[in-house]
């Protein structure tokens, strides 16, 4: 009956006739819902909640998403892995997730089975129900640039255990009055321009750049773009209006047509003024090197070979053990993502240290801080100046020491200049 009806309806229509229906296929068949097969999700997808009509029929009610309207047979249909939309069920058919088998303890067999020794020697499988904190912490550990090789251990009796996911309760009278000593939070306006990519939005006829998170207009002029120069092997940017300042006190490398000219050293600006990079590396001919955590005073680190004697290039081969200091190693140029990662770890570490500031004596704190950075530096990423300056000054940083630029500021990373 169905078939003949369909055939009758789908005769060749004359051009002026409206198409009143879509010829249906026969009923489609799916796997049994109890098997790991298909099930309907987000059933009854309506764009807006429709008003319930007061009179007349209520229309077809959406079917229960658990048991979709199909004649279940053993046939398996051909469908893409991600599922497909079914208008009849108002929802997507998706492959069912494999159900985890319930654990059934093995029945003891008198003859075979595990001996006590087997039981004791096999590792125990423990399942811990993850809490949001533990998940966050696990992710942080996975993503962190620290490796377990040289653990930074803090002595337990000195430091209270700090749950980083709760705010520390510290007595207010101990807190220093610092303008920006609040720790960084998600979408912190102080770091917005470091993190978010500006999005062009049309306002009238003008197109302006807008921060997608805070929605405020960028200070950049879209037509002329950003006027800035890349100044070192890290790809650090100095904005045009700061270039003079940068040139006043810094080693500059200019690369044109693949010729590396000699860098010229410029006189140092007055102490106390700000400049775009905190570190001055007085270097002769090594093109890409940066001061690193290794430039901290030697009493804070294990005394290895302190003499910084660069190897001669001819000398360098697999057999010769080089006595180069670790800052001599040419720096890998890291991607923006890696750089953001280092920056994230850095800010985290900084905030932890700042929180512990009142609980430990300064020496331990300083040592811990430096150890952290020696760890990160093993990954051989280049640090921009604002990260290293606090290390060189040998103190745990506070905001006066590296001034992260504010929301609408054009300057690149800025730090107090300790000449």
UniProtKB/Swiss-Prot annotation:
Instruction: Enumerate the InterPro entries for this protein.
Output: SatRNA_48
Residue ranges annotated as compositionally biased, kind Basic residues, are: 1-27
Region (Disordered) location = 1-29
**UniProt cross-references to Pfam families, sorted A to Z:** SatRNA_48 (PF17485)
- Report the sequence similarity comment from the record: Belongs to the nepovirus satellite RNA 48 kDa protein family.
Q: What is this protein called?
A: Satellite RNA 48 kDa protein
What is the scientific name of the source organism?
Tomato black ring virus satellite RNA
Which lineage? Viruses, unclassified Satellites, RNA satellites, Single stranded RNA satellites, Large single stranded RNA satellites
């Amino acid at each position: 009956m169905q078939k003949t009806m369909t055939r009758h309806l789908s005769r060749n229509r004359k051009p002026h006739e409206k198409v009143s229906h879509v010829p249906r296929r026969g009923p489609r068949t799916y796997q049994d819902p109890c098997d790991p097969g298909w099930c309907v999700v987000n059933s009854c997808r309506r764009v807006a909640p429709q008003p319930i009509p007061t009179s007349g029929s209520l229309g077809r009610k959406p079917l229960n998403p658990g048991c979709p309207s199909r004649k279940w047979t053993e046939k398996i249909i051909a469908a893409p892995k991600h599922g497909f939309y079914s208008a009849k069920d108002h929802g997507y058919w998706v492959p069912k997730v494999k159900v985890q088998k319930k654990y059934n303890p093995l029945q003891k067999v008198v003859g075979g089975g595990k001996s006590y020794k087997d039981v004791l020697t096999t590792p125990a499988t423990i399942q811990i129900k993850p809490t949001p904190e533990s998940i966050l912490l696990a992710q942080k550990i996975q993503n962190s640039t620290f490796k377990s090789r040289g653990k930074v251990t803090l002595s337990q009796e000195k430091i209270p255990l700090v749950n980083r996911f709760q705010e520390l309760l510290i007595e207010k009278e101990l807190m220093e009055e610092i303008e920006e000593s609040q720790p960084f939070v998600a979408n912190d306006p102080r770091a917005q321009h470091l993190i978010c990519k500006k999005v062009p939005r049309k306002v009238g006829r003008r197109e302006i750049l807008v921060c997608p998170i805070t929605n405020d207009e960028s200070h950049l002029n879209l037509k002329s773009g950003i006027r800035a120069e890349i100044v070192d092997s890290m790809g650090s940017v100095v904005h045009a209006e700061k270039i003079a300042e940068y040139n006043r006190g810094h080693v500059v490398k200019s690369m044109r047509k693949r010729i590396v000219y000699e860098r010229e050293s410029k006189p140092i600006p007055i102490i106390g003024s700000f400049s775009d990079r905190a570190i001055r590396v007085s270097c002769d001919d090594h093109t890409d090197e940066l001061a690193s955590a290794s430039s901290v005073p030697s009493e804070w680190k294990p005394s290895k070979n302190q003499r910084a004697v660069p190897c001669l290039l001819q000398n360098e081969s697999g057999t010769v053990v080089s006595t180069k200091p670790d800052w001599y190693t040419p720096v890998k140029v890291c991607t923006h993502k890696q750089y953001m990662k280092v920056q994230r770890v850095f800010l985290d570490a900084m905030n932890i240290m700042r929180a512990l500031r009142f609980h430990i004596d300064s020496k331990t704190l300083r040592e811990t801080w430096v150890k952290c950075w020696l760890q990160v530096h093993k990954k051989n990423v280049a640090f921009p100046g604002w990260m290293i300056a606090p290390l060189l000054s040998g103190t745990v940083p506070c905001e006066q020491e590296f001034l992260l630029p504010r929301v609408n500021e054009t300057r690149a990373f800025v730090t107090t200049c300790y000449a």
